[in-house]
Design a protein with these regions (language model features):
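A short, N-terminal "cap"/entry segment at the start of jelly-roll beta-barrel domains
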Residues: 1-80
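Conserved short histidine dyad/triad with adjacent acidic residue
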Residues: 62-72, 82-100
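Glycine- and acidic-residue-biased ligand/ion/polar-headgroup-sensing regions
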Residues: 90, 101-114, 118-119
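Histidine-centered metal-chelating micro-motifs
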Residues: 93-95, 114, 132-134, 138-143
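A short hydrophobic beta-strand segment most commonly corresponding to one strand
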Residues: 105-107, 135, 150-155
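Short acidic-glycine-tyrosine-enriched beta hairpin
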Residues: 119-138
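Asparagine-centered strand-capping/turn motif at beta-strand->loop junctions
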Residues: 145-148
């Protein structure tokens, strides 16, 4: 099969077949199965230690960004991309914060959250429910609150 890419896969470490791994082993390392995932309640524990209302867990599938976790051998390696689920217990919230270098996307799998997006002059608030998605550009503060009676689960 001809390589139609305008770049070389070898230029990006996580896109290159590791030395000593067969093609099948390499491709298997790029599959993240739900049964091998665990919820990491410690990734954002420093916030929950400040106030229990900030308790939430991350279940990583690809990459380790977004929460300051620097390494996780149980994820699909990635360059500049993170894919995880977040569990937000009823009544808990993600405090207002900003990412200046990345867009952040939330996709609601179940539950409902109140999402607030702000800059210096504006504020926006909405309720996200099952299968809703929002994209927050870099440079905006965002915060969320589980307004439902059950845990919220989002990508």
């Amino acid at each position: 099969m001809p390589d139609t890419a305008e770049f070389q896969r070898e230029d990006i470490e996580t896109w290159s077949q590791p030395e000593g791994k067969s093609f099948d082993e390499w491709m298997n390392s790029r599959v993240a199965r739900f049964e091998t995932r665990t919820y990491d309640w410690d990734a954002l524990k420093f916030q929950a230690d400040f106030d229990p209302k900030y308790a939430r867990a991350q279940c990583r599938y690809m990459g380790t960004g977004g929460t300051g976790v620097e390494s996780d051998e149980n994820v699909v390696p990635s360059e500049h991309f993170t894919f995880s689920t977040m569990v937000l217990p009823a009544g808990c919230e993600g405090p207002s914060h900003i990412h200046v270098d990345v867009e952040e996307v939330f996709f609601m799998l179940k539950g409902s959250i109140r999402l607030t997006i702000e800059d210096d002059n504006n504020a926006y608030e909405t309720i996200l429910k099952d299968r809703d998605l929002v994209s927050v550009p870099p440079g905006f503060y965002r915060g969320l609150l589980n307004v439902g009676q059950e845990e919220a689960l989002m990508l």
